[in-house]
Curated annotation (Swiss-Prot):
This is Sterile alpha motif domain-containing protein 12. InterPro entries: Aveugle-like_SAM_dom, SAM, SAM/pointed_sf, SAM_domain-containing_protein. It comes from Mus musculus (Mouse). Pfam families: SAM_2 (PF07647). Residues 77-143 form the SAM domain. Residues 44-64 are annotated as: Disordered. Disulfide bonds: none annotated.
Length: 161
């Protein structure tokens, strides 16, 4: 899968951007959106009446008022970020275990290192619930690895002659 995520160039009137959203997870006004919803959209610089860049706009209507940014790496997540993830991906366990995650200072880096034994020591007694959480963590690891590979691919494309 070839990925060109974002290319920026500086010119006297502003910054030129070209973006391709294949397989990249984007943050749009705080909500995670898979790139499928904006696939094959072209974003371009639109000058205002004075000739200066006003904003990036695309064919997608959501791009009109949304700021688009890549989500931060899981290793940099705070406890709050982890609790948001837990609520979204483990809604049945969230009420039971969010306090335990806070007490044990589970940040993104710690989340990626969770094991069955660690979850058990945190008070998650039922094996099926531990397995569900670990399955979600595994999926998160896979998404993070894909993201890292895309960034590496992008960097190697930009550096090659």
């Amino acid at each position: 899968m070839a990925v060109e995520a974002l290319h920026c160039g500086l010119n006297p009137r502003g910054i030129d951007h070209s973006a391709h959203a294949d397989g990249i997870k984007l943050q749009i006004e705080g909500e995670g959106v898979e790139s499928q919803s904006i696939k094959n959209r072209t974003f371009q610089k639109v000058p205002d009446q004075k000739g200066t860049p006003k904003r990036l706009q695309g064919e997608a209507e959501t791009a009109k008022s949304a700021t688009v940014k890549l989500s931060k790496p899981v290793a940099l997540w705070t406890q709050q970020d982890v609790c948001k993830w837990l609520k979204k991906h483990c809604p049945n366990q969230y009420q039971l275990y969010s306090e335990s995650f806070k007490q044990h200072d589970i940040t993104g880096r710690a989340l990626l290192r969770l094991t069955d034994k660690k979850l058990e020591r945190m008070g998650i007694a039922q094996e099926n619930q531990r397995q569900h959480i670990l399955q979600q963590v595994l999926q998160l690891k896979v998404r993070e690895e894909v993201r890292n590979l895309q960034l590496l691919t992008q960097a190697s494309v930009e550096c090659s002659p």
